[in-house]
Amino acid sequence: MYKRQGQGIGNFGDASCFSFHATKVFNTIEGGAVCYRDPDMGRRLYELKNFGIHGPEEVDAVGANAKMNEFCAAMGLCNLRHVDEEIAKRRAVAERYREHLEGVDGLRLNVQQPEVRSNYAYFPVVFDENLFGASRNEVMDALAQNGIGARKYFYPLTNTFECFHGKYDVDATPVALHVAKRVLTLPLYADLSMEDVDRICKIVLEQKL
């Protein structure tokens, strides 16, 4: 989503992080941003993005070079003009998917809430193998055999990565774990044709027993 009850999501919470990676609905090729309310947090973030430098001869923390370069910023300004058009096209694709897949036994789509305005970044489908008759992985393989890439967003869970082994309790996120084992994100981008959406859905539904 990018708006809730008419407010941009950057207005909620202490801070909101945005990715502007090339795969996002709005991108600057690479980069991101943080929105914040507390001026002290803003000063701290500014220092951390600039190697942790606090003053001419003072470094308070280990920081990074997280400043956006001018080329990426210029690309963002160019893309900003087209973001509404991009979202509208993505919405049409998502609605076409829903025409085919909504109400199918064993498929769960994200709930559309009236007070939320989506940016249609992804189209995730949660598969119930017992009801649908095929697992998420089997459907993904069938799509791949037809030259269609689908992603297991997001699998595996971050707290199951080997680098975090023993640091986080995997059992503390049972809902996320349940969904991660069953979710498949179907292709969604502004220039995806309705014919291709129909073909993707046909292949998905052909796996149903």
Label every model-predicted segment.
Residues 8:
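Conserved catalytic cysteine-centered active-site region
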Residues 1-2:
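Short, small-residue-biased leader/transition segments that mark boundaries at the very start
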Residues 39-209:
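PLP-dependent aminotransferase class I/II
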Residues 11-47, 70:
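Active-site PLP attachment segment
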